[in-house]
């Protein structure tokens, strides 16, 4: 079991129960899934870019990504419905906890000029979304084999009912919010 998951069960549940005065442990918010998304708009012209992005995503997450396709045709972007334009991975269970641990303790501190992540990126229902500008902050990515620097979106879906509860849950994991 991941260290962060043990920490959640032993400390965070008790801490949040006390802070929000929950009557049952099942009311305590928990992280349900983490979704990683990488949009590769340039893949229209060169399919190799999407394959490289998918292999980077697989290296970061530890599981094979799903290739996302365009939902509708947009002439301005020169895409047709069904064109492959990105990839995504949904992490749950053990892989999710391990990824969150690596994100908080290794990857985010490696971002250049890192001052913390915005505390305003909650969606109103306790879910948190953030963007990473370069995939090379993850130690699994070999810098010499990267064809181009790509960013990715990370969404942390929680069972929290409000932003305040979601923020308290992530703060309990020492998530580096900007002061």
Curated annotation (Swiss-Prot):
Keywords associated with the record: Ribonucleoprotein, Ribosomal protein, RNA-binding, rRNA-binding, tRNA-binding
GO molecular function: rRNA binding; structural constituent of ribosome; tRNA binding
Keyword Thylakoid on entry: no
Gene3D superfamilies named among the record's database cross-references: 3.30.1440.10
Cellular component terms (Gene Ontology): ribonucleoprotein complex; ribosome
Coiled-coil parts of chain: none
GO biological process: translation
PANTHER family referenced in this protein's UniProt entry, alphabetically: 60S RIBOSOMAL PROTEIN L11-RELATED
UniProt cross-references to HAMAP family, sorted A to Z: Ribosomal_uL5_B (MF_01333_B)
Function: This is one of the proteins that bind and probably mediate the attachment of the 5S RNA into the large ribosomal subunit, where it forms part of the central protuberance. In the 70S ribosome it contacts protein S13 of the 30S subunit (bridge B1b), connecting the 2 subunits; this bridge is implicated in subunit movement. Contacts the P site tRNA; the 5S rRNA and some of its associated proteins might help stabilize positioning of ribosome-bound tRNAs.
Subunit structure: Part of the 50S ribosomal subunit; part of the 5S rRNA/L5/L18/L25 subcomplex. Contacts the 5S rRNA and the P site tRNA. Forms a bridge to the 30S subunit in the 70S ribosome.
NCBIfam families listed in its UniProt record: PRK00010.1
Family in the record: Belongs to the universal ribosomal protein uL5 family.
Protein's UniProt name: Large ribosomal subunit protein uL5
Organism field: Vibrio atlanticus (strain LGP32)
Gene (name only): rplE
């Amino acid at each position: 079991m991941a260290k962060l998951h043990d920490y959640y069960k032993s400390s965070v549940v008790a801490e949040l129960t006390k802070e929000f005065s929950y009557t049952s442990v099942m009311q305590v918010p928990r992280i349900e899934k983490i979704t990683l998304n990488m949009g590769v708009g340039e893949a229209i012209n060169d399919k190799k870019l999407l394959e490289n992005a998918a292999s980077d995503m697989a290296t970061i997450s530890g599981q094979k990504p799903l290739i996302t396709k365009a939902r509708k045709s947009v002439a301005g972007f020169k895409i047709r419905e069904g064109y492959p334009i990105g990839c995504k991975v949904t992490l749950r269970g053990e892989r999710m906890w391990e990824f969150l641990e690596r994100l908080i303790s290794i990857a985010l501190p490696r971002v250049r000029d890192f001052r913390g992540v915005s505390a305003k990126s909650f969606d109103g229902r306790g879910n948190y979304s953030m963007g990473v500008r370069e995939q090379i902050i993850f130690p699994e990515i070999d810098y010499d084999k990267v064809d181009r620097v790509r960013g990715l979106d990370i969404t942390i879906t929680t069972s929290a009912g409000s932003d305040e509860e979601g923020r308290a849950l992530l703060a309990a994991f020492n998530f580096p919010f900007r002061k």
